[in-house]
Amino acid sequence: MDPELLVSIYASTAVSVGIILAAAGLGSALGWGLICSKYLEGIARQPEMRPQLMGQMLFTGGLMEAFPMIVLGMSMWFIFANPFTGAALAAIGS
């Protein structure tokens, strides 16, 4: 087994995981920005709806924050239990 192949697989996986985590963080930040801006717009239009809007905003934000945590778990799986190394070993017959 060529050690350079394993190094290449792990390096590509690390770069890919970094890109995936950055995209999830960016999506979460943009989502929070949109949710909060719409919340403030709703309060400006109907101030008496503030408690209901706040509850819905926090619930939606909590659901939205679950996505980066799921992505983090999947990324850790790719880093620590890399499925691509086994496939590469099987493909080259080692």
Swiss-Prot record:
- InterPro entries, from UniProt? ATP_synth_csu_bac/chlpt, ATP_synth_F0_csu, ATP_synth_F0_csu_DDCD_BS, ATP_synth_F0_csu_sf, ATPase_proteolipid_c-like_dom, F/V-ATP_Csub_sf
Instruction: Identify the taxonomic lineage of the organism of origin.
Output: Bacteria, Pseudomonadati, Pseudomonadota, Gammaproteobacteria, Chromatiales
The coding gene here is atpE
The UniProt entry, under CDD domains, shows:
ATP-synt_Fo_c_ATPE
Q: Domain of life of the organism in this record?
A: Bacteria
Signal peptide location in the record?
Answer: none
Q: Where is this site: Reversibly protonated during proton transport?
A: 65
Main location per UniProt?
membrane
State what this protein does. Answer: F(1)F(0) ATP synthase produces ATP from ADP in the presence of a proton or sodium gradient. F-type ATPases consist of two structural domains, F(1) containing the extramembraneous catalytic core and F(0) containing the membrane proton channel, linked together by a central stalk and a peripheral stalk. During catalysis, ATP synthesis in the catalytic domain of F(1) is coupled via a rotary mechanism of the central stalk subunits to proton translocation.
Species of origin:
Nitrosococcus oceani (strain ATCC 19707 / BCRC 17464 / JCM 30415 / NCIMB 11848 / C-107)
Q: Indicate what this protein is called per its UniProt record.
A: ATP synthase subunit c
What quaternary arrangement does the UniProt entry report? F-type ATPases have 2 components, F(1) - the catalytic core - and F(0) - the membrane proton channel. F(1) has five subunits: alpha(3), beta(3), gamma(1), delta(1), epsilon(1). F(0) has three main subunits: a(1), b(2) and c(10-14). The alpha and beta chains form an alternating ring which encloses part of the gamma chain. F(1) is attached to F(0) by a central stalk formed by the gamma and epsilon chains, while a peripheral stalk is formed by the delta and b chains.
Q: Name one GO molecular function term.
A: proton-transporting ATP synthase activity, rotational mechanism
